[in-house]
């Protein structure tokens, strides 16, 4: 249907786009911080204070780095190597989805709080922090879409039998 070179170009474009979106998501989340004075006390909000946001940064950074390192692998590798690479991509995709879900849950908690647990919403006090987290989540959702498109394309183009 498509030439080998055309398939390779599509795979590279998808991989670079996913790596770029993951890098943007990681950087945006890593830059998420805000300071305010509440009742005479200085309150800081930083991504490092929430393990799920740290996980989001680490997962996106790992996906970005691994996606770019894979580009160094020659396209003429064995079918076994291609399958191992596909399995690694699937695992990274699952980690990426888990990190996005965890960060999304924390963003929801920050925005609306939880009245049953007595947790107040913090986005009213630290809007800059919440805006940056929201921006990172938008980039993270783009990463997931691009990464799964790349996975589906890799599965489609991978030969089924040796």
From Swiss-Prot:
Q: Which UniProt keywords apply?
A: Cell membrane, Membrane, Transmembrane, Transmembrane helix
Q: How does it sit in the membrane?
A: Multi-pass membrane protein
Where located? Cell membrane
CC terms in the record's Gene Ontology section: plasma membrane
Fetch the NCBIfam families from UniProt.
A_tha_TIGR01569 (TIGR01569)
Q: Which family does it belong to?
A: Belongs to the Casparian strip membrane proteins (CASP) family.
**Which protein is depicted?**
CASP-like protein 1C1-2
Instruction: Please give the organism.
Output: Oryza sativa subsp. indica
């Amino acid at each position: 249907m498509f030439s080998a070179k055309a398939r390779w170009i599509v795979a590279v474009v998808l991989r670079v786009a996913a790596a770029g979106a993951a890098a943007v998501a990681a950087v945006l989340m890593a830059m998420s911080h805000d300071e305010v004075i509440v009742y005479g006390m200085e309150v800081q909000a930083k991504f490092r204070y929430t393990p799920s946001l740290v996980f989001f940064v680490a997962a996106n950074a790992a996906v970005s780095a691994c996606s770019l390192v894979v580009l160094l692998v020659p396209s003429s590798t064995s079918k076994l190597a291609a399958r191992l690479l596909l399995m690694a991509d699937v695992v990274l995709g699952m980690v990426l989805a888990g990190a996005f879900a965890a960060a999304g849950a924390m963003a929801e908690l920050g925005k609306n709080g939880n009245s049953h647990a007595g947790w107040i919403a913090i986005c009213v006090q630290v809007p800059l922090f919440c805006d940056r987290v929201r921006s990172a989540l938008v980039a993270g959702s783009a990463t997931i879409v691009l990464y799964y498109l790349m996975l589906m394309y890799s599965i489609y183009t991978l030969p089924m039998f040796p």
